[in-house]
Curated annotation (Swiss-Prot):
<keyword id="KW-0689">Ribosomal protein</keyword>
<dbReference type="InterPro" id="IPR018258">
    <property type="entry name" value="Ribosomal_bL21_CS"/>
</dbReference>
<dbReference type="GO" id="GO:0019843">
    <property type="term" value="F:rRNA binding"/>
</dbReference>
<keyword id="KW-0687">Ribonucleoprotein</keyword>
<dbReference type="GO" id="GO:1990904">
    <property type="term" value="C:ribonucleoprotein complex"/>
</dbReference>
<dbReference type="GO" id="GO:0005840">
    <property type="term" value="C:ribosome"/>
</dbReference>
<keyword id="KW-0699">rRNA-binding</keyword>
<comment type="function">
    <text>This protein binds to 23S rRNA in the presence of protein L20.</text>
</comment>
<dbReference type="GO" id="GO:0003735">
    <property type="term" value="F:structural constituent of ribosome"/>
</dbReference>
<comment type="similarity">
    <text>Belongs to the bacterial ribosomal protein bL21 family.</text>
</comment>
<dbReference type="InterPro" id="IPR036164">
    <property type="entry name" value="bL21-like_sf"/>
</dbReference>
<comment type="subunit">
    <text>Part of the 50S ribosomal subunit. Contacts protein L20.</text>
</comment>
<dbReference type="GO" id="GO:0006412">
    <property type="term" value="P:translation"/>
</dbReference>
<protein>
    <recommendedName>
        <fullName>Large ribosomal subunit protein bL21</fullName>
    </recommendedName>
</protein>
<dbReference type="InterPro" id="IPR028909">
    <property type="entry name" value="bL21-like"/>
</dbReference>
<dbReference type="Pfam" id="PF00829">
    <property type="entry name" value="Ribosomal_L21p"/>
</dbReference>
<dbReference type="InterPro" id="IPR001787">
    <property type="entry name" value="Ribosomal_bL21"/>
</dbReference>
Amino acid sequence: MFAIIKTGGKQFRVSEGQEIYVEKLNVEPETTYQFQEVLAVGGSNPVLGVPFVKDAKVTAQVIKHDRAKKIIVFKYKKRKKYRCKQGHRQSYTKLLITKITV
């Protein structure tokens, strides 16, 4: 059985026992989190939501919060001595999907 959930402006296809990385959630590590915005549930009896599946929930265990690898944004203009270097690290939350209920 799998489900498609929406979090952080993105959609994820998840199944039980899967670990996923999502945009940072405002919850403590080692707690459970429930996703209410379930777009679809698949398996032997698939269900599509309009826009969400009614009474469907995905429960996940919060493993940790972390930050991704640093990326460098470098802008320049040729022959003008314009250089601009900026770095960015995105925060994320690592989750373990424990249960999908319909």
